[in-house]
Amino acid sequence: MYNETPIKRRPSTRIYVGNVPIGDGAPIAVQSMTNTKTTDVEATVAQIRALEKVGADIVRVSVPTMDAAEAFKVIKQSVSVPLVADIHFDYRIALKVAEYGVDCLRINPGNIGNEERIRSVVECARDKNIPIRIGVNGGSLEKDLMDKYKEPTPEALLESAMRHVDILDRLNFDQFKVSVKASDVFLAVESYRLLAKQIRQPLHLGITEAGGARAGAVKSAVGLGMLLAEGIGDTLRISLAADPVEEIKVGFDILKSLRIRSRGINFIACPSCSRQEFDVISTVNELERRLEDVTTAMDVSIIGCVVNGPGEALVSHIGLTGGHRKSGYYDEGERQKERFDNDNLVDSLEAKIRAKASQMANRIQVKDTTE
């Protein structure tokens, strides 16, 4: 039940992606990107809705062709979550999706074209009140920067970003955020640190092409965790070669671990050993599966024996400490007379957790209406 994070957020300006506030102390937004063919409207809409169901604040959609832009029009009309159009190479696609109500435009400085093309996109975005993300990527830096630096470096990524920040500044356009992603953790982290010192615009965090579900989650947690702990970051995306739904789950888990933003249950569980009085691993796995729909932020400790169980239960909303045949149950750190049969733990705990989540949600609603 540790509520406050010691992290002090980097000051930044405020923009909006649809109805989602970004920067200036707003909650860090978690986003993902569809991996369907955008021209397959049905599949893309289904995936966006699945992402929204697990808490995605923003969803990015690749729009590589004019046909995809026409599909985007239908997709946008079919979903409620804010959509970012991912644009490369052809600036005219950005102009087209702007007509169709896109909530944000992501452009890549490495391939979007000359300043005149950027000017066209900016003027369109200004007219329609659409923010822009300048998305620098270590894998697609401008040729002159690669010639200058020989390889992606923090200085190269920074120069690419600032080159386009300066263009937007000259055009008096301040509704933008910036990212400087790389697949190497140290390269990405140092690039963001340099950028954070240069501008006050919101920063979108990510370790690009991080890898598969396990390795990519670890790499992202290490890199983004370093930045978030320093107060850097206003939105984030976990790039996994996996189901995009997993990106949202990992993103919230990272924020939850730093006490920056919580959604759903934070399970505190022992890895289990010979002292466990019930099967901790299967119990936790089943509860995680059953309780994915719970959005109330709460801590649940599930410990297999009395060594650490009571201590963890003291700082949990719901706690379970393994005992012989029956396990001890705690509510808000207080030991309850009720004990749970070890053969029926999952059903018993699920009921208690759901009741507690409902109680806590009602408490929050009452507080909001009285303030």
UniProtKB/Swiss-Prot annotation:
InterPro entries: Dihydropteroate_synth-like_sf, IspG_bac, IspG_bac-typ, NO2/SO3_Rdtase_4Fe4S_sf
Cofactor requirements of the protein: [4Fe-4S] cluster
Gene Ontology molecular-function annotations: 4 iron, 4 sulfur cluster binding; 4-hydroxy-3-methylbut-2-en-1-yl diphosphate synthase activity (ferredoxin); 4-hydroxy-3-methylbut-2-enyl-diphosphate synthase activity (flavodoxin); iron ion binding
EC number assigned by the record: 1.17.7.3
UniProt keyword Lipid metabolism, yes or no: no
Gene3D superfamilies on file: Dihydropteroate synthase-like, Sulfite Reductase Hemoprotein, domain 1
SUPFAM superfamilies found in the cross-reference section: Dihydropteroate synthetase-like (SSF51717), Nitrite and sulphite reductase 4Fe-4S domain-like (SSF56014)
Comment on bound cofactor: Binds 1 [4Fe-4S] cluster.
Pfam family, one: GcpE
Tagged with keyword Oxidoreductase: yes
Keywords, sorted A to Z: 4Fe-4S, Iron, Iron-sulfur, Isoprene biosynthesis, Metal-binding, Oxidoreductase
Sequence positions that bind [4Fe-4S] cluster: C270, C273, C305, E312
Reactions catalysed according to its record: (2E)-4-hydroxy-3-methylbut-2-enyl diphosphate + oxidized [flavodoxin] + H2O + 2 H(+) = 2-C-methyl-D-erythritol 2,4-cyclic diphosphate + reduced [flavodoxin]
Pathway terms, separated by semicolons: Isoprenoid biosynthesis; isopentenyl diphosphate biosynthesis via DXP pathway; isopentenyl diphosphate from 1-deoxy-D-xylulose 5-phosphate: step 5/6
HAMAP family listed in its UniProt record: IspG
UniProt record similarity statement: Belongs to the IspG family.
PANTHER family on file: 4-HYDROXY-3-METHYLBUT-2-EN-1-YL DIPHOSPHATE SYNTHASE, 4-HYDROXY-3-METHYLBUT-2-EN-1-YL DIPHOSPHATE SYNTHASE (FERREDOXIN), CHLOROPLASTIC
Job description of the protein: Converts 2C-methyl-D-erythritol 2,4-cyclodiphosphate (ME-2,4cPP) into 1-hydroxy-2-methyl-2-(E)-butenyl 4-diphosphate.
Name used for this protein in its record: 4-hydroxy-3-methylbut-2-en-1-yl diphosphate synthase (flavodoxin)
Organism the protein comes from: Shewanella sp. (strain ANA-3)
